[in-house]
């Protein structure tokens, strides 16, 4: 059954309806419309945990999308999928690519920080204190930038920075 017929999530349906209206009203090229359609399908598949399908749609959207800002969100969402799959190195690559195109993407900065923090915890478990300190410092740097861009977000990160004297 096509995704459009089985999507019963109200928010996804609302987003889809609004997106369809905007695509019809705004002066956009066919290429831009196609790119956005693939992006929207990718988001829908991702929200349902269908990551392979989401990736296929995101890669198609990326092939068509020329706007750097819009591409940043495609890269970011691909990074989210790799994070969910435990592929942290690949996720970092995509988060960095998102930031190259849109340096004001606090959620990408936050996710990079989360990965470095996780790696720092792993280093502690493996008895690698120096490596853990370096990883925690990197996490702190990314969290500080994310918080600078979105001061009311990332409360847990703000608390961690205070508790570890890294603020």
From Swiss-Prot:
Location(s) in or outside the cell: Plastid, Chloroplast thylakoid membrane
Q: What does this protein do?
A: Essential for the assembly of the photosystem I (PSI) complex. May act as a chaperone-like factor to guide the assembly of the PSI subunits.
Mode of membrane association: Peripheral membrane protein
Q: Which GO terms describe its cellular component?
A: chloroplast thylakoid membrane
Q: What keywords were assigned to this record?
A: Chloroplast, Membrane, Photosynthesis, Plastid, Repeat, Thylakoid, TPR repeat
Per its UniProt entry, which superkingdom is the organism in? Eukaryota
What name appears for this protein in its UniProt entry? Answer: Photosystem I assembly protein Ycf3
Q: According to its UniProt record, where is this protein mainly located?
A: plastid
